[in-house]
């Protein structure tokens, strides 16, 4: 399969330049900020889905936790195809705007529409509501990939400077965390505002989803208009056959490790995120604490800000490893506080945990960009789309499995919406909120011990610089 989308106009494509030239060019601050807004926009809408959709489905929409868990699992099967599909499409896209940028232009509106439909309660039978949930949730999931995968796939094309990539990813993660924090903090109060004081109001959830979707849509257009794909190799200008693209993954162990970490990390994060409201409503007897605790995500910004500094001094691998260990410690402190119903201790544990996850989230995209370079260095094939598309796939797959695990654990514990919960149900909520994330962070930390790219990066980049210079010289001779 080879799909080539060729467009020609007065907007010239960036000239192919030797890597030595690219290394001297820093991305302007205006473009850094515009790029960072992409994750801000994604999180405004999709964090509403990932954080609150299970609660919406069980306590507002009116379907069981077991059905929701199954839905999330089925959606992950679809993700097994949609992530790589969008990656292949990006690798075979050639427009006057570049390879990744146009997807924000093309899919901002469809993503916004389905984001709203997810939080719409139609006047249907229970069976038809389940069908509606499947169509709208899987739809928003697929369209999220269409606007999210380009955020990662464009990074190797924005700059080839590894430190500049860390800076770009850090700013992006800062804004992404800010977006997630904003929606996590204000969602329930806004729902209550539009819903006449109730957080279970269907109209309230619809209005919040609509507002966030429109804001996100406008931001995607801004991101499209203010970013530029400036790093283009001779190879990147050609449509690479799928079979050739897949060669970029052969023996690409850094990619395998990062994809595994992305999967297991987000699995744990999702189980915690989706039961936050449940945990404080039923285990801590105060649902209003959920917004406060979710708002503490802001402290992750401190870790995000200093990530470039720590990565430069102790390496990307060690910085992420430190983050995983902090996240585990935070969870344990939180658990101790919950047993004593001690909110200050829970707050401390949450802050420590968010500091840890701030280090992690800021580096995943950078390490994936490095795996693009590694794939080209090892196999001679540069395929940003297919390599980075698995970032979205693995994260969403982890979140989906996490959602399924959450639903199954709640169901096994005998959770009944809007009722006093049994001891078994409370333990099920605690399992999701505390222990599943600890397992995810621990397995990720173990996987990081096998990540060695930091040590070979100088030689790898020097070899690629020489390779690109030779390819460009040959291309000039053939003109």
UniProtKB/Swiss-Prot annotation:
Membrane topology label: Multi-pass membrane protein
GO cellular component: plasma membrane
Origin: domain of life: Bacteria
Keyword Transmembrane appears in the UniProt entry: yes
Induction: Expression is negatively regulated by XylR and is subject to CcpA-dependent catabolite repression.
InterPro entries per record: MFS_2, MFS_dom, MFS_trans_sf, Na/Gal_symport, Na/Gal_symport_CS
Keyword terms of this UniProt record: Cell membrane, Membrane, Sugar transport, Symport, Transmembrane, Transmembrane helix, Transport
NCBIfam families xrefs: gph
Name of this chain's protein: Isoprimeverose transporter
Organism annotation: Lactiplantibacillus pentosus (Lactobacillus pentosus)
Gene: xylP
């Amino acid at each position: 399969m080879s799909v080539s989308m060729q467009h020609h106009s007065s907007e010239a494509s960036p000239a192919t330049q030797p890597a030595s030239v690219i290394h001297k060019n820093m991305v302007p601050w205006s473009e850094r900020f515009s790029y960072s807004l992409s994750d801000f926009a994604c999180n405004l809408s999709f964090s509403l889905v990932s954080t609150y959709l299970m609660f919406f489905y069980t306590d507002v929409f009116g379907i069981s936790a077991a059905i929701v868990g199954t839905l999330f699992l089925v959606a992950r099967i679809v993700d097994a195809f949609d992530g790589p599909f969008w990656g292949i499409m990006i690798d075979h896209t050639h427009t006057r705007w570049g390879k990744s940028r146009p997807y924000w232009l093309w899919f901002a509106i469809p993503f916004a529409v389905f984001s709203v439909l997810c939080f719409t309660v139609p006047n249907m039978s229970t069976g038809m509501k389940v069908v509606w949930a499947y169509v709208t949730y899987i739809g928003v999931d697929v369209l999220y990939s269409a606007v999210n995968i380009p955020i990662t796939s464009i990074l190797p094309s924005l700059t080839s400077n590894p430190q500049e990539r860390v800076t770009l990813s850090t700013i992006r993660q800062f804004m992404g965390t800010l977006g997630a924090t904003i929606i996590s903090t204000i969602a329930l109060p806004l729902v209550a505002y539009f819903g006449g004081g109730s957080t279970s109001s269907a109209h309230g959830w619809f209005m919040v989803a609509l507002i966030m979707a429109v804001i996100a849509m406008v931001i995607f257009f801004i991101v499209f208009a203010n970013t530029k794909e400036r790093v283009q190799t001779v190879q990147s200008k050609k449509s690479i056959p799928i079979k050739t693209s897949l060669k970029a993954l052969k023996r690409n162990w850094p990619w395998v490790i990062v994809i595994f970490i992305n999967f297991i990390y987000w699995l744990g994060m999702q189980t915690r995120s989706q039961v936050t409201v449940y945990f404080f409503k039923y285990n801590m007897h105060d649902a209003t604490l959920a917004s406060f605790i979710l708002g503490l995500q802001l402290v992750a910004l401190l870790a995000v800000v200093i990530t470039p500094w720590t990565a430069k001094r102790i390496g990307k691998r060690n910085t992420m490893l430190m983050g995983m260990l902090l996240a585990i410690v935070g969870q344990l402190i939180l658990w101790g506080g919950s047993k004593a119903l001690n909110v200050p201790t829970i707050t401390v544990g949450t802050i420590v945990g968010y500091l840890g996850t701030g280090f992690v989230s800021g580096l995943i995209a950078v390490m994936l960009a490095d795996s693009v370079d590694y794939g080209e260095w090892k196999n001679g094939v540069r395929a940003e789309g297919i390599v980075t598309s698995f970032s979205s796939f693995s994260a969403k797959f982890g979140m989906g499995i996490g959602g399924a695990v959450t639903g199954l654990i709640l169901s096994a514990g005998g959770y009944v919406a809007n009722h006093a919960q049994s001891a078994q149900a409370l333990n099920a909520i605690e399992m999701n909120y505390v222990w599943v994330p600890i397992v995810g962070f621990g397995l990720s930390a173990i996987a990081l011990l096998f990540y060695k790219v930091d040590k070979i990066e100088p030689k790898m980049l020097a070899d690629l610089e020489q390779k690109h210079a030779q390819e460009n010289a040959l291309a000039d001779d053939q003109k």
